[in-house]
Amino acid sequence: GPDSTFLRL
């Protein structure tokens, strides 16, 4: 989900 993309930062 969108949070997963944020964690990749």
Curated annotation (Swiss-Prot):
GO biological process, alphabetically ordered: neuropeptide signaling pathway
GO CC terms, sorted: extracellular region
Keyword Secreted attached: yes
UniProt key word Signal: no
Signal peptide location: none
Family under the similarity heading: Belongs to the FARP (FMRF amide related peptide) family.
Organism the protein comes from: Karoophasma botterkloofense (Gladiator)
Leucine amide PTM positions: 9
Superkingdom in the source lineage: Eukaryota
Function statement: FMRFamides and FMRFamide-like peptides are neuropeptides.
Localization of this protein: Secreted
Annotated keywords: Amidation, Neuropeptide, Secreted
Annotated protein name in UniProt: Extended FMRFamide-3
